[in-house]
Each structure stands twice: as structure tokens, then as C-alpha cells.
């Protein structure tokens, strides 16, 4: 009997060794790595690696689980297929009916019908269908801003007296970058320091943000995400993108503060300097929703509404073509943190929603990939770069075209 056991072990050993040689990596959802928000059942992908030549996939199995409970909600079973990119999860829509974070993993079988080990887990999130209940907020409504409507404002059209007069009549508040803040109370964050009052613990907190034209989102003074131009621009009459963030670890027990820095972007092109066109879909506007799920199954939601306040930011001019002006004297230290006195800030107004359909941004963000230090500064010749006395103002307008690669002559 002992001999038979050893023989069986020796026969199985090659299969175990081969299975360990197969590695599953580069897990993607809709061709993207990392957290992705999807509107329906996702299409998943992976790469199979093996040191053995000729190794190929003959079947796969996908498992999807709730990220914060670990409960399995869908399993494909063993599917005979060599497909490993944009693999549909047919039938999962019956199980994926809540806007939760889901984790998934996959294993494959090779040409000898030997299974690999399960891959590491990756995550995706089902888009919320409740964002429409939030209000779009900002400093001024489109009606009060007197912003011209239409897409004809470019080239020679802008030189017409009636067009110039229309743009000059725009309320200056509609052109400004603003800071928005909202304080709220919550229970304890994931882990220790349980809320003595409610005893509830947070298992998941997700923020949905759409700030047009561009925004920067912070929670308790810390920037959330690594995007520099969020959301990605679009034809705002057709589609409007929002971003999703997992902020479970950033929430604190007790009081929290949401901060949003809002600018014009392509949504509200103002001109005034170099520009290719001048068009506005409305003044800067914000839609925000933070959903907090507790361990006991309850949840609470913080939305953009009249409870928010705003003030002008230190960015005194901003245009996607003409750059920005920054006045550091207007900085308000701690404006997006707990304890800041916002009594002088003004209440927001509810604005008209953009015409486009609200959709999750599924494309990768624009972000800083690498930073470079200054290596050397060289004066090209003996010319005087700028002649000016103290406190004299000189203005250099940015441009997309460099006409002189040496010095700027003023």
C-alpha cells in the first residue's frame, strides 16, 4: 500500500511542477490595469507566462468576489478557450447589481490540461446609477453669468463688435477658479478606534467626482488620485466623465473635510490671451458623491448640495490655451482641513446640469510620469534680459508656437 502511495505521488509530481511554472500576470479590466469603473459586466484580460516553449492556454476559470467581504458572487467554471483578452463575463450581470468594489482572479489550463495556480486579485467597480440625485453646484448660474452660447466663437468671428460686446458682458465670477469645501461627520475608519456612539465600522468608502472643466480633489488636506487633468475632456453636450476614488483609508473618525479646487479647462474657455477658440458650456461646476458603507450593512451618502461653501482660489486667471496666473497672497492655509474658519466663505448656488450623459471615465488619467531637476542655466549672450525697476510689472503671454529659441526680447 505504501509503495502505491509513493508511485501515485511520483506520477502527480510532474503535473504539480508544470502548474507552478505557469504564472498569470498583467490582469486588466477593459484593457486597463488597476481599479476600473464599468457600467456593465466587465471584459477581463491576463497574460500567461511560462519558461517552457510552446506552453499555451486551453481553458480558463474566472472568479468574482465582493472585495470587502470576500464572498464569491460569480464563477465562470472551466471554459474551454484560448482567449485571454477582453474575455466577457457573461451572466455576471445577475450577480453584479450593487455599486461595490469587486475583486477577481483567474486560473488557466495548459495544453496538457494542467491547471495553473490562481492569479493575484485585481479590482473593478460597478458604476453607480444614483449620481443623478446629486446637485451641480458652483459660484454662479449660467443665467446670471451671461455667458454667450454656441460654438461659433473662433477666428474672425471674435473680432465682430457684437461678439466682443457679448463676451465683455460676462460676469467675472463666471471666469474664476474657486475652492469648494464641505465638512461632515462619520464613524471610525477601517480598523481601530471604533465609534463609541454607533459602534459601526467603515468597510468601504467611495467618492464619485465630476468637476468641470478640471478639478483637484482633496480629503482632509491630502490630494486624492494622481491625475493632473481630471476629468478627461469631451464634447460636454454629449458625454460628461466622472472619476471614482476609494477613500476608505483616508477617512477619519469624527469630522472630515472635502476640498475641491475647480477651474475652467475646456468646459469654459475664456480667451483673453492666445486661444484657438472661445466657447463656454457654462461656469465651473461640481457634482460630488461620497458613499460610505458600514459593517452592519447600512450606508450614508455625502452629496454636492447647498451645504457646501466656496471662495475664490489663488488662481486669478485660468484658460486652457492662455495658461494661469497665481497670486500666492490669496492662499488660505488649511482651507481643505478640519478646523479652518470658513465663516467668510459664501454659500454655493445650484447650477444647471451639463447636457451630456454622465459616464465613468474609463481611459487612463493624464498624470506626471517623471520629474526633472534643473541641471544648468546658461546665459546665451550679454544682452540684458529685462530692464525694470522694483515693483515694475512685465507680462509674458504663453503661446503654443516658439518663434525665438534664444532670449525673449521685451
Predicted segments, located by residue:
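Recognizes extended acidic, P/S/T-rich segments that occur
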Residues: 56-101, 111-117, 136-141
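Pro/Thr/Ser/Gly-rich low-complexity, intrinsically disordered linker/stalk tracts
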Residues: 20-52, 125-127
Amino acid at each position: 500500500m505504501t509503495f502505491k502511495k509513493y508511485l501515485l505521488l511520483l506520477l502527480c509530481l510532474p503535473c504539480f511542477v508544470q502548474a507552478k511554472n505557469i504564472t498569470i500576470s498583467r490582469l486588466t479590466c477593459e484593457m486597463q490595469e488597476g481599479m476600473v469603473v464599468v457600467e456593465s459586466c466587465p471584459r477581463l484580460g491576463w497574460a500567461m507566462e511560462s519558461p517552457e516553449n510552446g506552453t499555451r492556454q486551453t481553458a480558463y476559470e474566472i472568479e468574482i468576489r465582493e472585495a470587502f467581504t470576500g464572498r464569491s458572487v460569480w464563477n465562470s467554471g472551466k471554459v474551454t478557450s484560448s482567449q485571454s483578452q477582453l474575455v466577457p463575463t457573461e451572466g455576471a450581470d445577475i450577480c453584479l447589481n450593487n455599486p461595490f468594489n469587486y475583486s477577481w482572479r483567474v486560473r488557466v489550463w495548459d495544453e496538457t490540461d494542467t491547471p495553473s495556480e490562481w492569479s493575484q486579485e485585481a479590482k473593478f467597480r460597478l458604476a453607480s446609477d444614483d449620481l443623478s440625485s446629486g446637485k451641480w453646484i458652483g459660484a454662479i448660474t449660467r443665467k446670471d453669468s451671461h455667458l454667450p452660447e454656441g460654438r461659433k466663437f473662433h477666428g474672425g468671428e471674435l473680432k465682430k463688435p457684437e461678439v466682443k460686446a457679448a463676451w465683455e458682458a460676462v460676469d467675472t465670477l463666471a471666469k474664476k477658479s474657486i475652492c469648494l469645501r464641505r465638512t461632515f461627520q462619520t464613524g471610525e475608519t477601517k480598523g481601530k478606534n471604533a465609534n463609541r456612539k454607533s459602534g459601526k465600522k467603515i468597510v468601504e468608502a467611495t467618492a464619485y467626482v465630476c468637476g468641470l472643466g478640471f478639478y483637484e480633489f482633496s480629503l482632509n488636506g491630502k490630494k486624492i488620485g494622481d491625475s493632473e487633468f481630471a476629468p478627461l475632456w469631451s464634447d460636454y453636450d454629449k458625454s460628461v466623465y466622472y472619476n471614482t476614488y476609494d477613500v476608505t483609508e483616508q477617512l477619519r473618525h469624527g469630522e472630515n473635510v472635502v476640498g475641491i479646487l475647480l477651474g475652467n479647462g475646456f468646459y469654459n474657455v475664456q480667451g483673453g490671451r492666445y486661444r484657438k477658440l472661445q466657447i463656454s458650456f457654462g461656469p465651473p461646476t461640481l457634482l460630488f458623491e461620497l458613499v460610505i458603507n458600514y459593517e452592519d450593512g447600512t450606508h450614508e451618502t455625502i452629496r454636492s448640495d447647498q451645504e457646501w461653501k466656496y471662495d475664490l482660489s489663488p488662481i486669478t486667471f485660468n484658460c486652457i490655451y492662455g495658461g494661469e496666473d497665481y497670486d500666492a497672497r490669496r492662499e488660505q492655509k488649511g482651507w481643505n482641513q478640519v478646523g479652518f474658519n470658513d465663516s467668510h466663505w459664501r454659500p454655493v448656488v445650484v447650477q444647471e446640469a451639463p447636457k451630456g450623459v454622465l459616464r465613468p471615465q474609463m481611459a487612463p488619467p493624464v498624470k506626471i510620469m517623471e520629474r526633472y531637476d534643473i541641471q544648468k542655466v546658461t546665459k546665451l549672450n550679454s544682452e540684458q534680459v529685462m530692464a525694470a525697476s522694483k515693483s515694475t510689472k512685465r507680462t509674458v503671454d504663453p503661446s503654443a508656437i516658439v518663434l525665438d529659441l534664444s532670449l525673449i526680447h521685451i
